[in-house]
Amino acid sequence: MVYVLSDVHGRIDRFESILHQIDLNEDDRLYVLGDVIDRNAGGIELLFRLMRMPNATLLLGNHELMMRDCVVDGGNCELWLLNGGMTTLLEYFNLPTESMLLLWQYLKNLPVQVELRVGGT
């Protein structure tokens, strides 16, 4: 099965509940259409959770883009902070350096789109 979700915004409890409800297994694919961070605590944990899931693909949402612009590209953080990024920023800066670098690489390489063929070969 192919599953798609978006806008979890740090709610790892809801994310885990959804995975339990759909009984996601290794043969399934999960596409997350961005916005797993910000507004609530748990966004950084969600990013690492998705990184460890070989059958999950996170696409770059506007919140991940704002974080990437701020912490990866050294850009302006104001827009991100105005959109609920403070919780995520504090979680990020509490990470060990090695974890920051892993997350930095992950954010840098998130796809903006994927092409799926549904019901075809």
Sequence positions of predicted segments:
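N-terminal active-site segment of His-dependent metallophosphoesterases
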Residues: 1-48
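Active-site neighborhood of divalent metal-dependent phosphoester bond hydrolases
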Residues: 40-121
